[in-house]
């Protein structure tokens, strides 16, 4: 497909079920995650917190950006009044087979309006990719969304919250706050020319913690 019209963030939402079927992957729940996230090695299983509902978190880190994005797409969605208090971050979402129809309709909507959506994205709204259109579609389709993930699973804009720092009163432990107290680390809001390096530094700090246990001998 044309990567100008079908960018990676759109692809993950449009083709997730197609890809699972193509690879013949069985599943109970699906977690769709942006590449800017890292998940802590010993974090509790978030799949146990979903109640088998569409699960995401309420995004309130950049309210002006969100407001402008919502207003920018409002006319496209026929003036639909989106409830900003239910606006979610699409970088980490969990869903299951009962949401297949939702994603299929989202894909159909995109295919039918791809040129207009690309123009809105690049020339008018200039705020993100699929996140705000997905929020509109979630509310238009009246999808039940679980917003109750604990805060440790949604560490975003970590530099603004001073989570890269550590407790200066204990010289023996210089573990950054986000590693010490968080489960799901999102390296968003950073200058793009710094993000990869910061993620690499983080990986070098923790990579030895990710040990894959060998299967039991049969």
Give short role names for the model-derived ranges.
Residues 1-218:
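Glycosyltransferase catalytic domains, chiefly GT-A lineage
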């Amino acid at each position: 497909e044309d990567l100008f019209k079908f960018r990676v963030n759109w692809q993950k939402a449009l083709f997730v079920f197609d890809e699972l079927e193509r690879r013949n992957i069985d599943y109970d729940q699906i977690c769709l995650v942006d590449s800017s996230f890292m998940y802590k090695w010993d974090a509790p299983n978030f799949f146990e917190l979903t109640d088998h509902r569409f699960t995401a978190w309420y995004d309130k880190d950049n309210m002006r950006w969100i407001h402008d994005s919502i207003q920018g797409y409002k006319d496209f969605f026929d003036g639909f009044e989106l409830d900003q208090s239910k606006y979610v971050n699409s970088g980490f979402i969990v869903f299951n087979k009962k949401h297949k129809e939702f994603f299929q309709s989202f894909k159909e909507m995109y295919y039918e309006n791809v040129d207009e959506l690309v123009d809105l994205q690049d020339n008018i709204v200039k705020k993100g990719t699929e996140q705000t259109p997905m929020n509109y579609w979630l509310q238009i389709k009246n999808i039940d969304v679980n917003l109750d993930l604990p805060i440790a699973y949604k560490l975003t804009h970590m530099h603004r919250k001073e989570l890269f720092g550590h407790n200066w009163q204990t010289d023996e432990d210089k573990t950054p706050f986000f590693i010490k107290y968080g489960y799901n680390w999102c390296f968003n809001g950073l200058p793009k020319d710094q993000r990869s390096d910061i993620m690499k530094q983080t990986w070098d700090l923790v990579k030895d913690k990710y040990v894959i246990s060998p299967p039991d001998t049969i």
